[in-house]
Amino acid sequence: MAAFTLWILVLNVFLLGFQARKLASNLKFPIQKCDDSTPQKNFNSFLWLVKRTPPAYFYGTIHVPYTRVWDFIPMNSKQAFTASQHVYFELDLTDEKTMRALMKCQMLPSGTMLRQTLPRKMFKRLKSHLRYIKRMIPKWIKHRDQETSSAGPYANKLYEMLTKDWDKKRPIWVMLMVNSLTESDIKTRGIPVLDQYLALEASRNHKLIGAVENVDEQCKPLNALNASQVVFALNQSLHFQERLRRGQVQVTYTTDDLIDHYNCGDLKSVLFSTQTSLPTLTVNSSLEQRERKRAQEIDQYFRNELIFQRNKRMAQRVITLLNNHPEKDFFFAFGAGHFLGNHSIIDIMKKHGYDVEYVKPEQELPSFKAKKSLNTRRERRKGCRGRRKKSKRCQKKKKRKRPDYSRVRLLQVATRRWNPTRKPYPTKLSEAPGARDISSRKAAASCTPIWTVSLALTCAVTCLLTYSGFR
């Protein structure tokens, strides 16, 4: 999940939790519906061109199922993605280490449970809300499975997957989980979001995938909130969800509205209208004044840490990539909010002297024939044949040290069991001594051959030596 999306969720919790009805009147934007017959020029483009040879592109993504927006993305945006061989995201969502690190950063310290960090009443309210979600999931996914019997087991598995280890997670991540357990999000669960779909397509087409951030840089701002701020945010989130269940409040601006704005409307007016300031409270009680002040402090913190500071960091790393690799083309796919408003990545790039141009939906892209990707093994082997053998890259490959297998052989000798007859160890049940007897056969089958253990140990040491610099 992109950190910008997390910030939008957090801010929306405060907005809706304080005065949902007043917010409804402030968010009445004209939404233009798009269909297949809509002309290409009316589609909204989130593509920017960095004028250089070869070209580099910025593309603004949105964290929704790609099937809802892919057909409305202008053709020149898709062509820019197809033509680029180096695709960079905020995080590399195709990397298993990245996904494991994301899960790890959400967890509380070892031995600490969520009930120990929350007030008792709030923890009971949270459990009650999760039980409600578990009861509602089978009804929400009825359109997938017509038979109730098949929907039940799937619903239970889906609930367990969405709420896995929730009682061991940090409260801020539990709050984000609660806000994502909505009917519309659960119905589309399993469909890759747009940025994830682009990463999968880049991997399938053997493009070189990279990231401009690491997991710690996205997790630390969220985990750095103090306990009182997190409890306050989770309380506001639960309060809104409880009022929503009782029918006391309605969501006036939904994900569908955001998708319509992304496809053919003005996303800038939507994103930044909800980021300007918190709505003014009409009731001047001391409690609400304290809540408003605390919400504004959290709002300012997230605005600075998750938007402005990240824009600076990502823009600087983009500039480093462009300077260090002038011969390569690039396609940078970040959250759309990072390219809009003041102090955006586009503004920072222009301040550093780069000519960045907004690309309209029907605008032609600069002609450039990208070099063939060298991402596959077969293509990498072909790269050092013929005249290319004298290149610096190929010479470096020759200088690499081969693994020192003598240490592995010594280890094999040291772990080998003494065998005076020098006969090979039985590898088949029929060759084992006493195999004629049924009980002996079972005993021979249950005994692990010594060569299996030795082989596993040898493989482990080989990997250790190989990745420790013995090349």
UniProtKB/Swiss-Prot annotation:
Listed Basic residues bias regions? 369-402
Extent of the signal sequence: 1-24
Q: Name one GO molecular function term.
A: metalloendopeptidase activity
Q: Which GO terms describe its biological process?
A: negative regulation of Wnt signaling pathway; proteolysis
Output the Pfam families linked to this UniProt entry.
TraB_PrgY_gumN
Q: Which cofactor does it need?
A: Mn(2+); Co(2+)
Sorted alphabetically, which InterPro entries does this protein's record hold? TIKI1/2-like, TraB/PrgY/GumN_fam
Residues with an annotated glycan are: N226, N235, N284, N342
Keywords from UniProt, A to Z, are: Glycoprotein, Hydrolase, Membrane, Metal-binding, Metalloprotease, Protease, Signal, Transmembrane, Transmembrane helix
For the region Disordered, what residue ranges are annotated?
369-406
Q: What is its main location?
A: membrane
Does Transmembrane show up as a keyword for this record?
Answer: yes
Q: Which residues lie on this side of the membrane: Cytoplasmic?
A: 471
Its Gene Ontology cellular component terms are: membrane
The free-text cofactor remark is: Divalent metal cations. Mn(2+) or Co(2+).
EC numbers? 3.4.-.-
Q: Where in the cell is it found?
A: Membrane
Q: State the disulfide connectivity.
A: none
Residue ranges annotated as Extracellular topological domain: 25-449
Which domain of life does the protein's organism represent?
Answer: Eukaryota
Q: What does this protein do?
A: Metalloprotease.
Q: Which family does it belong to?
A: Belongs to the TIKI family.
Name by which UniProt lists this protein: Metalloprotease TIKI homolog
Species name: Nematostella vectensis
Its taxonomic placement starts with: Eukaryota, Metazoa, Cnidaria, Anthozoa, Hexacorallia
